Amino acid sequence: MKDNPISLFHELESYVRGSKDTLHRYMYACILEQRLADLLLLSRCGVHPDDEDRLAVRLASQRSLCVQAASDLAEGTEEARGSTPAWPDCKVTKSSAAQKRPELLSLVKVMQELRTPECSGYDLCDLEVCREDALHWLRDHADPSSPPVLIGVRTGGAFYAPLWSSALQQRWGNKALYHTVRALRMPSDPGASLYLPEELSILPAAIEPDTDIVILEDQPHTGGTVLELAGRLSAKYRLNKPVWVSSPGRLFQIENGRLAKCSDRIPLNTGTRKRIWQMLGNSEEVAEFLLPKLGLTDAHPADLEAVPYKSVPQWNDPMYRREVPFRINPKKTPFYIRRKSTNEPVVFAKFIGKDLFGDFQFHQLKKFEKYFPDILAYQDGYVMTKYEPGLKEMREMFVNMPSAVTREICQSVSGYWKTLLDSCQISGGHPVHPLADHWQARLGEMEDFIGRKLPYDLDWFERSLHTEWTSSAHVYTSLPYANQYGHWKARLSAGQRLKTYRFHIDSTWGGTSSIEVELASFLLENRVRPDDFRLLVNQVKKEAGSLTIEAVTDALPIACVLQAANLLKQAKDESRLSKELILSEAMQSFEYLQAMKPKLSDVR
């Protein structure tokens, strides 16, 4: 998994180097701690060549840096101190990990991704409250004579544990250390958590009988992740007292194999001004706050209102903390700013994450400005763009427009993948696409849902889904969540000037994908003709030397299964797509693929 010099992670390192923001530096330090801890785990499992002792020393040093950065953050230090450590490369591929230790596949996948923790994406908190959580635990729930063993569960817990350690060092100095462990997924049961003995053995060999253990984790859902870890720790240390669990603002104890809530408070800093996502539901407040930032010189506050793109569920309001599970989740709450007098939308606002993750995402997004409406502002994790009325779906244009127009579309959108390769490339991608294991089950579920058999070539799909993409360029992208044709639009002006748009470029909730699958998804969703297929692939090939038309053709069935999986998801979530719409879309896609298959031999 050797990192490309232009990889996403080196882009992140460069961005943080240019920032003096203490929160940016703190979160990057925690991301780096996770990277080093994962590398040490791979080394101890015999699949990474780096020296264990050297990695262990560097990891201990990095954790000290995390605690210092946590103290700076909690104390309100205005400007970050010290240098930004370099991003450590990794020389492990998924195929080599699979051959030696199949259970490490999920770890290598995690290491390819810039995962947004819940605290920055969809269970928002102000991180500094975690330090107050630790002091609250000391004051109201425990009076230990020795420092507790602090264990953060990577990913989320790695951002909380240093803040606890920083608080506890006020009493115990450098003895208040912390550790992190990675919860992996069992190959035989993806819903179950797995902690490897090679990592648990790094924890203290023994502890005093009255020592407390505190596990730091994102908000527990079922509690399965922390309950499994607590069980392993109880066996390791022969515990005679309950294990504590903390997520931002919350404290639990494990009693009789269950999580019992001890305290709960809204995890927001009361000294911080109100953010947009705290104003949701109050249209006038949102509009009045944003107007000075949007450059709408002809608008008056009384004539503007904020209108949810979707309904704003009450559980997004901090006052509804009693709801379970509770989240402050702006991911679900895009909105328009609209003129009351004309009902005309003028601004569209979408949340892309807060703190370092949102800020870096916005930094990346600006590289794609050519494919965006005009960006008016970025505030509190929301990107606000000029509302663009009258856009046409690109699919409609590929189907109905003359070849001169569709060729121009292909020329225009090819630059999107160039920018993606330049800014979001990762290394060591998937030898076989993740959908390969269960693709027939997914299509079977779709057939059951629509009550029809899908027309597809079983051999072609089986060969495609098990293609090894080891020589491909891989990117971190929004594709797994935003591959529908509705994300691609265009406008042809009266003077025949073409402007193309790609919506939902942000990969805050994204994943890894090969460039072949990226292109195949675009071609399938937009019903691209064979000649345009060839033109687009050859344009992108200029930036991705290993790309071939044959490989993109081989990826088309993957795009079809990916679309089916997303349609099924939308049938179940809040959007609740109708059965009739899903039937129409699925059948058209599979029929398009069947009709295209004999023509693709000419494209090759």
Curated annotation (Swiss-Prot):
- Keywords attached to this entry: Antibiotic biosynthesis, Glycosyltransferase, Transferase
GO biological process terms, semicolon-separated: antibiotic biosynthetic process
User: Which residues belong to the signal peptide in this entry?
Assistant: none
GO MF, one term, reads: pentosyltransferase activity
Superkingdom of origin organism: Bacteria
How many cofactor units bind, and how? Divalent metal ion.
EC?
Answer: 2.4.2.49
Which cofactor is essential here? a divalent metal cation
Summary of pH dependence: Optimum pH is 7.5.
Q: In which pathway does it act?
A: Antibiotic biosynthesis; butirosin biosynthesis
Temperature effect, per record, is: Optimum temperature is 27-32 degrees Celsius.
Q: Which reaction does it catalyse?
A: neamine + 5-phospho-alpha-D-ribose 1-diphosphate = 5''-phosphoribostamycin + diphosphate
Its biological purpose:
Catalyzes phosphoribosylation of neamine using 5-phosphoribosyl-1-diphosphate (PRPP) as a phosphoribosyl donor to generate 5''-phosphoribostamycin in the biosynthetic pathway of butirosin.
Annotated protein name in UniProt: Neamine phosphoribosyltransferase
Q: Which organism is it from?
A: Niallia circulans
Could you tell me the gene encoding this protein?
Answer: btrL
